[in-house]
Amino acid sequence: LEAESRCLSWTELEFLVRDKSRRPLLERARLMGLPVSIPYDAEVPIKWQDDLFTANRTNHSPDDLKVLDFSSLWAGPLCSHLLLNLGCKVVKVESRNRGDISGSATPRLFSVLNKDKELLIVDFQNEAELESLRQMICDADIVIEGSRPRAFEALGIDRRSIRSQQTSAQHHNQLWLSLTAYGRFGAAAAWVGFGDDVAASAGVLDRSSDGGYGFVGDAIADPLAGLQAALTVKECLTRNLRGLLDFSLFRAARIALETVERLYDSPLAPLKKVRTRC
């Protein structure tokens, strides 16, 4: 914002933002790794780059499937929680130095989503532990990745690196779910996003008759992504498909919005009063 003071009130912040062009401000915020968005952003890529193929073995019962879940917060843990309820064995992988912050921020939600999963704590700075983890990834039936791709690439546990260590059978029978804010390819792969701002970017917003905007629910793109990702994984298992699912919070929010508007054959009606939240 190029402000002289680092301590701004909300009133001062609103005044500074009001005089700025949206797109340059958004681009600068993204360079700084901030979760910022423009409502109904038409420049966000909406082409999903899934890479799916038919598995080279017959379908297995969910009871026979092992899920490695590297995600945190809400979307990924909700997805693996639903897969657990289907019968899959789920192992939640956490960093020894940086665990899932939702455990302290929202302990009740964390307990509901993760209480019946096996917990694996890994020191990502320890090469021996990393190598053991790589072998676990090779053997897993489903991998849930909840970080931007470059984080896994830096550790050598990304899908391409793991592929070089897998047998053909392991690779062709593994489903890799990539859960990101805006997708894993192109410039959008580096963008930071959370449930509220990504939903706004997709157009999932409260709208008042005077043109104002407000959030819908609480970080609504997160549960939408978790639910839709679990349904998509289940569909892949039913159809014996494996490979890569490029799933994002933005994709889930857009699908939900377009589905509701298609069902009602019109854009969502504006609300009488916008609910705002800071």
Where are these regions (language model features)?
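N-terminal segments that mediate ammonia production and transfer
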Residues: 1-7
